[in-house]
């Protein structure tokens, strides 16, 4: 009877080691695919290879156009340092320049990851920027004449032209976001949706700030 002791002990140790191995074996990874806005998520097989969601031509047009749109806003803010001593306007301009420069990098990466060109086609004779480069006109963008007037202004006159121009510019961006979401099949990419929504919220808030600042100049 006592001769069975070692065998029983080995059996117990074997069972314990198997149980421990089972506990230490990591669970198979779960791949969850986010749904489009308003749609449920999907659970995919663990061996699913990642791929970018399909894009709409309007998505590409929106990103390309918004890069050009942001580029002019950054160009406008670059004038502030040498054209006005208004500290509040300088602070606002620095925020706009920083945020829109970062957003341009995001949009360029988004397009490049999908093999799309960064710049949009510009049929016909486009407007020119302050450096004489061709410039596509998106909603709300300042004309070449408006940009020259802004460049020539100083002090309080510059403040007024900058604020009215940037309010116009921001309202154009809101129009672009609205057009994106009003287009069937567009804006379904999660990254694009989040970016466009954040841009809309940010620019609405900045419009209210600039309207308040503009009142002080009158």
What name fits each language-model region?
Residues 1-3:
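N-terminal secretory signal peptides that target proteins for export/translocation
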Residues 7-17:
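Bacterial N-terminal signal peptides
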Residues 23-218:
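All-alpha RGS (Regulator of G-protein Signaling) helical domain and cognate RGS-like helical scaffolds
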